[in-house]
């Protein structure tokens, strides 16, 4: 009986929350061909080393309550970068704001950790040289799905 109870306790605690792992590459050597055939140099976040960064960057998806771990590698051309989790309620050490959290130097990597607090749509972006980096493409979407499985994040509005 004790074994069955322990087994059920472990299963129930494992079902409640899960972990989302994300791998992002920060790059400044991307290219984007526009409608008239011109090629633009773009910055951005890529899902792997073999692709140019898409604009916007890769989607980060998690469920409310999940532990999210972002492994961010900076392979840019001598630039520092961060990942600011815009609108998410995360601790200061993982917020990606220069001089308040940490920068990821060229050819280095850093881990960002947070528990997905509230369902909704959010944005991540580099917070070093914010204007230039955002205009060049260093941003991407975040979707935190409601823990109850519904398709809405609030009622009555």
Predicted features, each with a name:
Residues 17-93, 99-103, 108-109, 144, ...:
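N-terminal, post-signal-peptide metal-ligating segments of extracellular/periplasmic oxidoreductases
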Residues 135-157:
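Extracytoplasmic/periplasmic copper-protein system
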Residues 3-13:
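Sec-dependent N-terminal signal peptides
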Residues 130-132:
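Short, solvent-exposed loop/turn segments at the edges of extracellular beta-sandwich modules
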Residues 127:
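Thiolate-centered catalytic microenvironments shared by cysteine-dependent enzyme domains
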């Amino acid at each position: 009986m004790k074994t069955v109870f322990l087994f059920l306790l472990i299963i129930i605690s494992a079902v409640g929350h899960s972990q989302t792992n994300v791998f992002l590459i920060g790059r400044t050597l991307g290219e984007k061909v526009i409608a008239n055939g011109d090629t633009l140099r773009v910055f951005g976040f890529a899902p792997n080393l073999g692709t140019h960064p898409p604009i916007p960057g890769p989607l980060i998806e998690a469920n409310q309550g999940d532990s999210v771990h972002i492994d961010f590698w900076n392979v840019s051309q001598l630039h520092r970068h961060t990942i600011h989790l815009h609108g998410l309620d995360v601790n200061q050490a993982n917020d990606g704001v220069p001089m308040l959290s940490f920068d990821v130097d060229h050819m280095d990597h850093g881990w960002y950790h947070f528990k997905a607090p509230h369902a909704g749509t959010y944005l991540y972006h580099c917070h070093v040289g914010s204007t230039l980096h955002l205009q060049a493409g260093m941003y991407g979407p975040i979707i935190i799905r409601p823990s109850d499985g519904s398709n809405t994040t609030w009622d009555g509005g």
